[in-house]
Amino acid sequence: MQVSVENTSALERRMTIAVPAERVENEVNKRLQQTAKRAKIAGFRPGKVPMTVIRQRFEADARQEAFGDLVQASFYEAIVEQKLNPAGAPAVEPKSFEKGKDLEFVAIFEVFPEFTVAGLESIKVERLSAEVADSDLDNMLEVLRKQNTRFEAVERAAQNDDQVNIDFVGKVDGEAFAGGSAKGTLLVLGSGRMIPGFEEGLVGAKAGEERVVNVTFPEDYQNLDLAGKAAEFTITVNSVSAPVLPELNEAFFAQFGIKESTLEGFRAEVRKNMERELRQAIKTKVKNQVMDGLLAANPIEVPKALLENEVNRLRVQAVQQFGGNIKPEQLPVELFEEQAKRRVVLGLIVAEVVKQFELKPDDAKVREMIEEMASAYQEPEQVIAWYYKNDQQLNEVRSVVLEEQVVDTVLQKATVTDKSVSYEEAVKPAEAPAAAE
């Protein structure tokens, strides 16, 4: 078998392969012999059909099958021989497939980039440290209470944080517009759910009162037909309800699946959850900085096939997450290209770090991570057992642990600065990660 390879770009390869005619004919004859054993042709007993008849009837199909199989087999042999690592399926261009001649074809494909991870010493990481103070715990309990607020009807004027039940009709230039009217809408004043001026116009209103509120749609309003236009809303207030925060009692604790009947026990459970979230937030911020540093220090080209596959994965995820009657391929590629490129590049870099430093998932760290996740459940031992009985779930944890080991490896060489901050600052969502260049 003859093989020649041309580098048509940094990652693209144009491989010409010639398979000897003898091998081609052997493959064709093998298929014809198999066909002869099962062929049913009038006038002949099964298995006794002359080969000349078999060739007349089936040689074209046998040759086509042989072509497909030989292309696949010889391509694999060629990339092994040439020590190439394709990043996707090849585009095949037949050149010669005549009877009695060598099978010749061209395979065009991309290879994975070859590189060594560098610049670890140039990476700078700020590692935060924080504690859950009593004041942080108090604030969290108030947040939990507010999340479970109920509303009771009152006979007074509405104020911010009250919930009003309203009917409204909106008009622009004296004409009602689509989506501008509703009945029985529940609205918490001050929530910012409606356009500016709408909620403010209801402060001081009482049940049974009708108000006319004049507003202007924002210039960046999603409905371009309404953006920047003045509107008049006629609003009828059906009822006004005041917020009532729940008491910190056993019934409230039970809503969170916590069996504790005392405030002290509940606070301890909430603190434990906050500390777990704090550890995860700090770990995530460190990881993001490490990954950003790896990206900046290792600019590499991305095979188009990998990028396309990742874009398609993100499209499918978007449809699954947001629903709607839309097919993934209808979503614009541009929406996902930046994220897809970052994920692909990081995937290649992380894989190279694993290879370069000969990393393997640490079983003790795998167990530690599973125990950490299980601690959030009422029956942690059952959760731990479930993970170890499910290979897919266990392998996912092993992958996460391996990625953490990559981060730890980088941190050993990077410049790390420790900084003490408040709980609120530590758990505050990080800024969007940098894109791959």
Swiss-Prot record:
Please give the start and end residues of each transmembrane region.
none
Where is each PPIase FKBP-type domain found? Answer: 161-246
What keywords would UniProt list here?
A: Cell cycle, Cell division, Chaperone, Cytoplasm, Isomerase, Rotamase
- What is the gene called? tig
Q: Which domain of life is it from?
A: Bacteria
Q: Which family does it belong to?
A: Belongs to the FKBP-type PPIase family. Tig subfamily.
Q: Where in the cell is it found?
A: Cytoplasm
One of the GO biological process terms: cell division
What is the main EC category here?
A: isomerase
Q: Which PANTHER family match?
A: TRIGGER FACTOR CHAPERONE AND PEPTIDYL-PROLYL CIS/TRANS ISOMERASE, TRIGGER FACTOR-LIKE PROTEIN TIG, CHLOROPLASTIC
The answer to keyword Transmembrane helix applying to this record is no
Q: Does the keyword Cell cycle apply?
A: yes
Q: Which reaction does it catalyse?
A: [protein]-peptidylproline (omega=180) = [protein]-peptidylproline (omega=0)
Under Gene3D superfamilies, the record lists:
3.10.50.40, Trigger factor ribosome-binding domain (3.30.70.1050), Trigger factor, C-terminal domain (1.10.3120.10)
GO terms under cellular component: cytoplasm
Q: What does this protein do?
A: Involved in protein export. Acts as a chaperone by maintaining the newly synthesized protein in an open conformation. Functions as a peptidyl-prolyl cis-trans isomerase.
**What is this protein identified as?**
Trigger factor
**GO molecular-function annotation terms?**
peptidyl-prolyl cis-trans isomerase activity; protein folding chaperone; ribosome binding
Q: What is its EC number?
A: 5.2.1.8
Comment text on domains: Consists of 3 domains; the N-terminus binds the ribosome, the middle domain has PPIase activity, while the C-terminus has intrinsic chaperone activity on its own.
